[in-house]
């Protein structure tokens, strides 16, 4: 008896077993794995399948996205093969991937986020033959760039008629790359186009060519502008933008639901609810600009293929534009975009009964076909608790209790006591690693507090925030949802029953309620459940023995007597904390310690007698991936758009954005956002929390923060690969990007920023570095001609630029700067600025630390008179320059350290940790892990370096902190 032959393609055997990207090209109607060296290269005559595997933050099963990309010259048969093979790949992965159709030039933001900064499809294909850039003679090309974050680069005819006033264009010539900014073009699109220029420069010019900016409508007598127009046959007016069919984007419409049966679509006249989606059927949700195919878990593979084909036919017969997005989701694994099309989405876990049933059937099907599904899922192994980033210690803590229109400062001995009937304002002033004064400002809302006190707490906190010029991060925290950074400020934090404000007392009296406010001479029971500095919150509970639990420790107050009760299953940390809490509540009183089972009669008497009790099941918040969104308000309804694979570069200074970590929600505000809009941050944040509560099980009482660009705290930065030097460069998005990538300044930038400050100095240092290090610009192997080093002329230009930076009153017009080595110049800028702005420092910056040196921010604005009560202590601890971790470091370079170690380029883990007793000197302290050998790296992190750097930046940072490599 012969076994059944697998119908699934063997090219997909064993895929999806680790995070990262895998790509196949369709060749002779079969998927062929693409070499990793060719990732990001797409030929317009081919079709591709792209699998993106990600590891969820909470562990458990991997998450999969499958994209099939269709080149504009790809044949219909190849495109159809890609669609069918995508379904097979999904089946191989257990049938839970989200599938996306991608047309060349109209790719989704998520797809483009895998290939930053952009993709520029190449001519040719497998059938017609490939043309590589190396084989081609250099040809001048004109590109149009669109997109504020995910940039779409499209080649257009090299002619003046292609230009317009509304878009951004890149003209790539053999010796120079020009960016033409249409007069009406978007500032953020101009900034993203610079990233495309950097990509062209590195890919086709070996990193060595000049870059020039040409502004539409500005006819200065500049050589760059003149050269640009000469290439088009001389200057002449350009026409208005012509709208073509490919630019048509349908508006998002009210969703329509179609059932799909035997390849036929039927419009369902019903309200769109989750309950009508049957697990043995496929459905189409038509939203105009977006189409979603929903697939029930119990459908067969052939049914899924037929549904995809039916939707393709639907698009053709409806004559939908190419910009129409098509996404296929599986029951139980619907993405946020799909769920948001419904009025609400009752939350069930992805591993619901229906999902598990379907997954089991798919697994059985694969086994029958002899397919190895070893890599289809990842077991849910327990995850070690990770201590989140906490605020620097030794700061100044001020706490105020709201009492009507007044606020009362708590004395030092009362700090940490919170009554559930009251509201509080907390201001913590501290100094970060670079000695900068920072503020953590929050207002805490007790669960039994009255609305008037809640409103007064918000108004007072907002007034303080305004008086401090928006520098603090401002948070709203509800009782029971305290974030770790808040809890860690108080050692201990104890939540007491009742309230002491006049408003609460009046409310209790008017309602005839029993006043349960904590009294120092009464009977009270406190539960200690936390085990670490960031979660050791203590809660007063009803003083009855049924509230005891073997997994916790308790403190019992009975008049002047104090008991600690130690559960048999409690931890050593809880036991220590119980003794500390008892001393905090009753300083100097002798504490009677009793273990579970050894209680005295006095103990039981205080609790009203002995009763049965059981172990309390501790609840843990679901760990979710962080998400970054842009948003808009339409008719009062919040609409959000996700930024995929986000980074610090996505925080654009003209925007307000929402970062949802599931543990807290941040509303981030760029410096260029209007002041009136900034005042709406909490309103926006609350609307988002309500929106996410309906679809993603987010609590509407989640901690809510607003933070202004340049004042991001450590627990916000940890979700990004953060570079402090970026936050001190002033200007709009375009000006910042121009300075960061090329050390250049735009004409508009000079007008808006006075003498230029850091931007001008960046330009000066870039020119100086380029002039005196011409060897750094050597050819990397490309045979194309490159511009000369410049010699004395370039050095003269560099000295002129440097002189201008140090003498802002003298502003000679500098010649265009060379545009090489963006990252190298950024490092040089940081080193130079450190020299220029460091105050009270007794040492000079080390060459080995140039790429990690931080720029000193501008001085803090003085507080207003009305905020004097909340003013922070200005005395910064310590003196002298400190490296990361607060240690004074000797002036030693990496090279010298390597020589002392016999030429080693790697170091042992014990020497690289931040608390090492024998630290390595002169390394990049922000990238300690890079100095580990490959074998020791895998021993420490449990994964290879390649796998580590494929993870999101925030996840890398958390793991580095866990292993003391930060």
Curated annotation (Swiss-Prot):
SMART domains: GEL, VHP
Compositionally biased region (Low complexity): 818-838
Gelsolin-like repeat intervals: 29-112, 150-221, 273-338, 414-487, 535-604, 645-716
Compositionally biased region (Polar residues): 894-910
Name by which UniProt lists this protein: Villin-2
One Pfam family cited in the UniProt record for this chain: Gelsolin
General function of this protein: Ca(2+)-regulated actin-binding protein. Binds actin microfilaments (MFs). Involved in actin filament bundling, severing and capping. Caps the barbed end of actin filaments and is able to sever them in a calcium-dependent manner. May regulate cell expansion in developing organs. Required for the regulation of plant architecture via the modulation of polar auxin transport and root gravitropism.
Locations listed in the record: Cytoplasm, Cytoskeleton
Residue ranges of domain HP in the record: 901-966
Disruption phenotype: Malformed organs, including twisted roots and shoots at the seedling stage, mainly caused by asymmetrical expansion of cells on the opposite sides of an organ. Increased dynamic actin cytoskeleton network. Hypersensitive gravitropic response, faster recycling of PIN2, and altered auxin distribution.
Keyword entries, A-Z: Actin capping, Actin-binding, Auxin signaling pathway, Calcium, Cytoplasm, Cytoskeleton, Repeat
Tissue: Mostly expressed in growing tissues.
Gene Ontology cellular-component terms listed: actin filament bundle; cytoplasm
Positions of region (Disordered): 771-910
Similarity comment text for this entry: Belongs to the villin/gelsolin family.
Primary subcellular site in the record, as a coarse category: cytoplasm
Biological processes, Gene Ontology terms: actin filament capping; actin filament organization; actin filament severing; auxin-activated signaling pathway; gravitropism; regulation of auxin polar transport; regulation of cell growth
Record-level Gene Ontology MF annotations: actin filament binding
């Amino acid at each position: 008896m012969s076994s059944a032959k697998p119908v699934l393609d063997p090219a997909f055997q064993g895929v999806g077993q680790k995070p990262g990207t895998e790509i196949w090209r369709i060749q002779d109607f079969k998927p062929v794995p693409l070499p990793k060296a060719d990732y990001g290269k797409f030929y317009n005559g081919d079709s591709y399948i792209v699998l993106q595997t990600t590891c969820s933050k909470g562990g458990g099963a991997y998450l999969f996205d499958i994209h099939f990309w269709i080149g504009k010259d790809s044949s219909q048969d190849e495109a159809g093969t890609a669609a069918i093979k995508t379904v097979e790949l999904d089946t191989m992965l257990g049938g839970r991937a989200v599938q996306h159709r991608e047309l060349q030039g109209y790719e989704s933001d998520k797809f483009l986020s895998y290939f930053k900064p952009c993709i520029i499809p190449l001519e040719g294909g497998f059938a017609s033959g490939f043309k590589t850039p190396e084989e081609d003679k250099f040809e001048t090309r004109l590109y149009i760039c669109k997109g504020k974050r995910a940039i779409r680069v499209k080649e257009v005819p090299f002619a003046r008629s292609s230009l317009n006033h509304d878009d951004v264009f890149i003209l790539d010539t053999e010796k120079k790359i020009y960016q033409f900014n249409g007069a009406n073009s978007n500032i953020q699109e101009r900034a993203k186009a610079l990233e495309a220029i950097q990509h062209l420069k590195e890919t086709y010019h070996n990193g060595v060519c000049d870059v020039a900016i040409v502004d539409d409508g500005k006819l200065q007598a500049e050589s760059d502008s003149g050269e640009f127009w000469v290439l088009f046959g001389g200057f002449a007016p350009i026409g208005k933008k012509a709208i073509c069919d490919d630019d048509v984007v349908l508006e998002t419409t009210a969703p329509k639901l179609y059932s799909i049966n035997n390849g036929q679509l039927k419009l369902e006249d019903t309200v769109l609810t989750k309950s009508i989606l049957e697990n043995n059927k496929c459905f189409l949700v038509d939203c105009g600009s977006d189409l979603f195919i929903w697939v029930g878990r119990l459908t067969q593979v052939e049914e899924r293929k037929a549904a995809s084909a039916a939707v393709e036919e639907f698009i053709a017969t409806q004559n939908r534009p190419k910009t129409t997005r098509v996404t296929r989701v599986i029951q139980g694994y619907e993405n946020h975009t799909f769920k948001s099309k419904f009025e609400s989405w009752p939350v069930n876990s992805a591993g619901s009964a229906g999902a598990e049933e379907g997954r089991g059937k798919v697994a059985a099907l694969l086994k029958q076909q002899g397919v190895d599904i070893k890599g289809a899922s990842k077991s849910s192994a327990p995850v070690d608790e990770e201590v989140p980033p906490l605020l620097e210690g030794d700061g100044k803590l001020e706490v105020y209790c709201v009492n009507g229109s007044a606020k009362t400062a708590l004395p030092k001995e009362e700090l940490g006591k919170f009554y559930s009937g009251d509201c509080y304002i907390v201001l913590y002033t501290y100094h970060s690693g670079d000695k900068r004064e920072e503020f953590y400002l929050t207002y805490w809302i007790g669960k039994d507090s009255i609305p008037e006190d809640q409103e007064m707490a918000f108004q007072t906190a907002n007034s303080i925030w305004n008086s401090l010029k928006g520098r603090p991060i401002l948070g709203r925290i509800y009782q029971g949802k305290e974030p770790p950074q808040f809890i860690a400020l108080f050692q201990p934090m104890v939540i007491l029953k009742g309230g002491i404000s006049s408003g609460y007392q009046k409310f209790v009296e008017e309602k005839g309620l029993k006043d349960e406010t904590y009294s120092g001479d009464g009977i009270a029971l406190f539960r200690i459940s936390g085990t670490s500095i960031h979660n050791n919150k203590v809660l007063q509970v009803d003083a009855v023995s049924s509230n005891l639990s073997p997994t916790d420790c308790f403190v019992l107050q009975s008049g002047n007597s104090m008991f600690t009760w130690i559960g048999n299953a409690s931890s050593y940390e809880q036991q220590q904390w119980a003794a500390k809490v008892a001393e905090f509540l009753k300083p100097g009183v002798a504490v009677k310690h009793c273990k579970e089972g050894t209680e005295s009669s006095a103990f039981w008497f205080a609790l009203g007698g002995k009763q049965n009790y059981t172990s309390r099941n501790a609840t843990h918040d679901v760990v979710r991936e962080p998400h970054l969104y842009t948003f808009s308000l339409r008719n009062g309804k919040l609409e959000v758009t996700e930024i995929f694979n986000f980074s610090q570069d996505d925080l654009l200074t003209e925007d307000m954005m929402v970062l949802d970590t599931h543990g807290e929600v941040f509303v981030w505000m760029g410096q260029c956002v209007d002041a009136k809009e900034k005042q709406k941050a909490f309103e926006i944040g609350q609307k988002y929390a309500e929106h996410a509560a309906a679809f993603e099980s987010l609590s509407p009482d989640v901690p809510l923060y607003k933070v202004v660009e340049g004042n991001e705290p450590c627990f916000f930065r940890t979700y990004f690969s953060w570079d402090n030097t970026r936050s001190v460069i002033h200007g709009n998005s375009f000006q910042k990007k121009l300075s960061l990538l090329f050390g250049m300044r735009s004409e508009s930038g000079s007008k808006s920023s006075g003498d230029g400050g850091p931007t001008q100095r960046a330009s000066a240092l870039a020119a100086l570095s380029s002039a005196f290090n011409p060897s750094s610009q050597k050819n990397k192997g490309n045979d194309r001609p490159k511009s000369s080093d410049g010699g004395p002329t370039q050095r003269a230009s560099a000295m002129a630029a440097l002189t201008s930076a140090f003498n802002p009153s003298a502003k000679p017009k500098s010649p265009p700067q060379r545009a090489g080595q963006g990252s190298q110049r950024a490092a040089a800028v940081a080193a130079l600025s450190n020299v220029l702005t460091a105050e009270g420092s007794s040492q000079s910056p080390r060459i080995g630390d140039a790429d990690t040196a931080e720029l000193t921010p501008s001085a803090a604005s003085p507080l207003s008179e009305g905020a004097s009560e909340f003013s922070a202590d200005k005395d910064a601890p310590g003196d002298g320059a400190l490296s990361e971790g607060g240690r004074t470091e000797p002036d030693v370079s990496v090279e010298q350290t390597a020589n002392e170690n016999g030429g080693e380029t790697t170091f042992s883990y014990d020497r690289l940790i931040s608390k090492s007793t024998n630290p390595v000197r002169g390394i990049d302290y922000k990238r300690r892990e890079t100095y580990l050998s490959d074998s020791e790296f895998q021993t420490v992190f449990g994964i290879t370096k390649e796998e580590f750097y494929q993870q999101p930046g925030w996840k890398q940072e958390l793991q580095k902190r866990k292993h003391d490599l930060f």
